[in-house]
Amino acid sequence: MESLVKTQYVWRALMELDWHPQIITGTSVGGLNGAMFVLDLYETARDMWLTIRSRDVMELPEENADLSALHQFLRRVVKEGGMDVTPLEEIVERVLDEDALRAAPIRFGIVTVEQRGLRPRELTLEDIPAGQVRDYLMASAACFPALRARQIDGVKFLDGGYSDNMPTGLAKTMGAEELVCVDLEGVGITRPNLTGLPTTMIRSYWELGDILHFDPDTAKRNMELGYYDTRRAMGYLRGCAYAVSCDAQSCEDAAAFAQKFSQLQRAVREKYPVTLTADVALKLANMTKDDQLAPLEAAAEDAGVDPTRFYTTRTLAQAFLAACDKDRMESFAPLFTGSSTAGQAALAALLPNTFLQALVWRTLTAPALPEVTEDEGL
């Protein structure tokens, strides 16, 4: 459930961009967020997710419980079919007004699954009997077996993630003509989008935390990531892992960095072919959305640069230079001056991520390499 809070700042970004949905569908606790979106409870949702902890939404053992107490707790959880989420239910009861939800201009739908036979149930608000919206929202979020199945009118229901974490088909059935999807890559099934509708997909490069973990610090981080992921998906930022400005100066700096990095990489590779492992490190970083910034972003990630801030190409480079191990970067200098030993080249091959950092560091700190034309190379 931790990754749920990311959608709060997706919400904030969409509001800033003056994007107003006519239909919202959601699964699991994403359905809870969707309901609050329909009710325009942004501040309520934000404050809630920034303050609650795991034990505020589910029954957990005491923090200092001994091994015997933990075993007893686990036996009871297994016997009762999952943890008790009465605290979460009380929160839902407090913040969600069913009458207001039904009167809202935004149509709303959720997914849950009948435990018997794992039969999916895609439900619009109109399909849900009066007085049972909170029950079905809790059913959609019943992450069995960790949490108890939700019983409604004698039928037990499970988390909608057993059917579809991202119900695009339901949205189309309800009349959607364009989709903005938030893929949290959560536990469960995420079916491919076969609607054929124009779609903007919002995903995070970063790990968002445990699904059943609530923590204010992690929540704040995920909210910031969600905000920037949304602006990037909408074309207002560039980069893959980091939020980088796409203004003219930042783009000019990115192009200059990419050219200089390519020159340096080519020069080192030709003299020390064993350092090709740095190419592998770059591919494994999976920075596929922005080739010009990919080496800088990969190096920044390895150096531990904060991804929850807004950067220009220049300030991201400065953040990397401040975070990297300068002595370690300097140790690769002979590879760049052509005076390296076989042992130093082998070390670069064995430490591809660190050497990729060194390549970026050298690109940012060394004078520009002269251009070599084909005629000059003969």
Please name every model-derived segment.
Residues 1-27, 35-378:
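Patatin-like phospholipase
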